[in-house]
């Protein structure tokens, strides 16, 4: 296996491990799979609009809308019309949402400690720097495909 493939496989495995743990540990909060991501970002950014939230989490608007509707129905967030633009709905956490967020943040701190165990500050800085560069690289394609574009490999014959 090439080192290039190993990088994304390792990132994927780390992400799936953390997501799986979170989904189990957040069951008592009555959060459905992956909803904690949305709630966390809404609590971090009170008043965020759904399109900005979708962009922040890197999901399509329809997926974000479903998750937001479920969070709203379950009493974790509320939507309010923006002043001067009634179409824009601002998202705010409820008291229940803030209470859940407190638990989610504690899990995040613990997961950070476990995941980064044995790494020096310099290694962590290097990892963050490299991962940001990788994200910036793929965001170009993500935005292009999101707007209906086709990446070049799709037009090549096998």
What are these regions (language model features)?
Residues 4, 60-61, 90-93, 147-158:
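Membrane-interacting alpha-helical segments
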């Amino acid at each position: 296996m090439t080192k290039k493939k190993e990088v994304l496989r390792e990132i994927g495995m780390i992400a799936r491990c953390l997501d799986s743990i979170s989904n189990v540990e957040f069951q008592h909060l009555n959060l459905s799979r992956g909803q904690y991501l949305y709630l966390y970002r809404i609590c971090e950014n009170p008043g965020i609009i759904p399109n900005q939230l979708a962009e922040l989490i890197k999901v399509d608007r329809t997926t974000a809308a479903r998750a937001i509707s479920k969070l709203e129905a379950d009493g974790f967030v509320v939507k309010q019309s923006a002043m001067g633009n009634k179409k824009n709905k601002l998202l705010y956490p409820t008291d229940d949402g803030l209470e859940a967020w407190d638990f989610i943040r504690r899990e995040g701190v613990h997961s950070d400690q476990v995941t980064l165990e044995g790494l020096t500050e310099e290694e962590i800085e290097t990892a963050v720097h490299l991962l940001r560069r990788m994200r910036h690289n793929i965001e170009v394609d993500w935005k292009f495909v999101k707007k209906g574009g086709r990446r070049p490999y799709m037009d090549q014959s096998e």
